[in-house]
Amino acid sequence: MAYPLQLGLQDATSPIMEELMNFHDHTLMIVFLISSLVLYVISSMLTTKLTHTSTMDAQEVETIWTILPAVILIMIALPSLRILYMMDEINNPVLTVKTMGHQWYWSYEYTDYEDLCFDSYMIPTTDLKPGEFRLLEVDNRVILPMELPIRMLISSEDVLHSWAIPSLGLKTDAIPGRLNQATISSNRPGLFYGQCSEICGSNHSFMPIILEMVPLKNFETWSVSMI
């Protein structure tokens, strides 16, 4: 999860987030090189008295500054499109979870089980135990098996919401009357925190999400106890 004064992204928990972090570094390096070139040109113009007042055209320069930006955009677009297709691709999910946004809580339904569904509300600050996080704790966590592809179907009962887990690289809008789909896959067990990421009313900041990824055996034990 995030911590105070953090400058970078959260630690990657899923293959998608790892790809997003690599793409972030790739794009940042390109932006840094372009910015350095622009600053160099500006400083050269301000510090030198040499000018080319007689130059009417320079086809070589015009060709370069037309082709070079196109190449740079292609270098950014290709990995971006690859990640976009990876995020939409779902192959044989082992589990499907339906998530519904409400004002102001989440409800979850494990569609592969007959009666496994529950609501998830934020725990008020006055009820927190020592070591728990303000505005991030919930009464019912989403328990899922790690290292397996899971399909999350996301919608809303009232207004726009957004189900987001930053460490998984996941943010999917919950839209009334529409069912959006996302893929969840975690490389390791643990607790992963998120929040509603779409302003949805006065209690928008009171819609936390806790995703607990556990080994498959532990998940099976939990699911049996919940039915």
Swiss-Prot record:
Record field: transmembrane: 15-45, 60-87
Keywords: Copper, Electron transport, Magnesium, Membrane, Metal-binding, Mitochondrion, Mitochondrion inner membrane, Respiratory chain, Translocase, Transmembrane, Transmembrane helix, Transport
Reactions the enzyme catalyzes: 4 Fe(II)-[cytochrome c] + O2 + 8 H(+)(in) = 4 Fe(III)-[cytochrome c] + 2 H2O + 4 H(+)(out)
Binding-site list for Cu cation A2: 196, 198, 200, 204
All ranges on the Mitochondrial matrix side of the membrane: 46-59
GO BP, sorted A to Z: ATP synthesis coupled electron transport
Binding site for Cu cation A1: 161, 196, 200, 207
Pfam families noted in UniProt: COX2, COX2_TM
GO molecular function terms noted in the UniProt entry: copper ion binding; cytochrome-c oxidase activity
InterPro entries: CcO_II, CcO_II-like_C, CcO_II_C, Copper_CuA, Cupredoxin, Cyt_c_oxidase_su2, Cyt_c_oxidase_su2_TM_dom, Cyt_c_oxidase_su2_TM_sf
Residue intervals on the Mitochondrial intermembrane side: 1-14, 88-227
Entry's cofactor comment: Binds a dinuclear copper A center per subunit.
Cysteines engaged in disulfide bonds, as pairs: none
Complexes and interactors: Component of the cytochrome c oxidase (complex IV, CIV), a multisubunit enzyme composed of 14 subunits. The complex is composed of a catalytic core of 3 subunits MT-CO1, MT-CO2 and MT-CO3, encoded in the mitochondrial DNA, and 11 supernumerary subunits COX4I, COX5A, COX5B, COX6A, COX6B, COX6C, COX7A, COX7B, COX7C, COX8 and NDUFA4, which are encoded in the nuclear genome.
Role: Component of the cytochrome c oxidase, the last enzyme in the mitochondrial electron transport chain which drives oxidative phosphorylation. The respiratory chain contains 3 multisubunit complexes succinate dehydrogenase (complex II, CII), ubiquinol-cytochrome c oxidoreductase (cytochrome b-c1 complex, complex III, CIII) and cytochrome c oxidase (complex IV, CIV), that cooperate to transfer electrons derived from NADH and succinate to molecular oxygen, creating an electrochemical gradient over the inner membrane that drives transmembrane transport and the ATP synthase.
Protein's UniProt name: Cytochrome c oxidase subunit 2
Source organism of this protein record: Malacothrix typica (Long-eared mouse)
